[in-house]
Amino acid sequence: LAQMPEASVESCFSGKFEKDFETYLTDQFPMRDGWISAKTAIEKATFKTESKDIYFADDDYLIEAHSKSFTAPSANANIGYLKNFMETCVETYGKDHATAMVVPNAVDILRDHLPKYASPYDEEVYLQKVADAMPEGTWFDSGSVLREHKDIQLYYRTDHHWTTEAAYYVYAAWAEEKGLSPLALSDYKKKTLTDGFFGTVDALSLIHISEP
């Protein structure tokens, strides 16, 4: 949460203090978390399927819609930045040592979990633009690999990240494509570092409806 900003002549005249103070008031509103949690619980109880750009999906998934992420001006600009970076990598290290990969969000891969009539942006359209912009032979389609392994949990239910197991299968597929021998999944040891973190999407909704 935002902390009380320090006032200075520079921050006051630039408007930064006012902006930071407004953020501070929003974050430090009394019982803020309780109000957000109650609001989300009421919305879910009244059969709302979405709140704050988050879908209440099947199997207790909280899935971000990312409704504006791919239509913002920065979305196309980022393709250009990545294109330039990859061209430099290919020129410097060679095509065989440069791979571009963008992992799709849960809202794209787990469409079968979304509420009825949900209509998120089609990320595949954007990812195809990214793929087309990359130097030949450098794009790796992680989405296809993930769709082949939908029998496992690919994304955390209450966070936007993919699971470690999902990342493993993409790594293994990439390694095989490059002619490398990937380590077996059994070669890794799973270790739980904490059971008290439910993720960023859970923090936005504060409803705590499921296990990660």
Regions found by a protein language model. Give the residues of each.
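Histidine-centered active-site loop/cap adjacent to the catalytic His
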Residues: 156-185
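Acidic helix-start/capping segments at beta-turn-to-alpha-helix junctions
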Residues: 99-110, 147, 187-196
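Charged, often glycine-rich, active-site loop that binds/positions anionic groups
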Residues: 111-120, 153-161
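Serine-dependent acyl-ester chemistry module
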Residues: 5-81, 108-116
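Residue-level detector of conserved catalytic or cofactor/ligand-binding positions
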Residues: 207-212
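Structured segments of extracytoplasmic/periplasmic soluble domains
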Residues: 85-92, 133, 170-181
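Extracytoplasmic/secreted proteins, especially bacterial periplasmic and envelope-associated proteins
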Residues: 77, 81-84, 125-129, 165-169, ...
